[in-house]
């Protein structure tokens, strides 16, 4: 989603740019594992859109510039990763990196933490599952009110939200 301004310039609106729904082709043994992979795959899937938004503001990037942004940071847009899995939020925001019980997830955890340190992810946010609009795209039991709000340009969180903004290297 992208934050913008209404045509009259009086209110902030949200634009849904892309929505992806797919299954993992990996065997997952825990909900933590499924949520961590969803976060990592979501970032991976969103990266081309993020780069496109950056290019719309700064002009077309040369391959060396794109590589430099990935290695050192420097996006002109602010990216917030939102999850409703508190265990994922805690493992990504902890001071010390701890190896997950499912050791195969360590690469995913390390990759997301690296993106946060470089500033490619400005903030990590945890929200209550009841406020998670992405769940409405895939689960039939989720209230459609949030989806309808997003389609009209509004995104509101009715429950407390935790936000972590890491310091850039």
List the model feature ranges, each with a label.
Residues 25-169:
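RNase H-like nuclease module associated with reverse transcription
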Residues 4-37:
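A short, polar/acidic, helix/strand-boundary loop motif
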Residues 1-4, 104-105:
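Gly/Ser/Thr-rich active-site loops/lids in small-molecule metabolic enzymes
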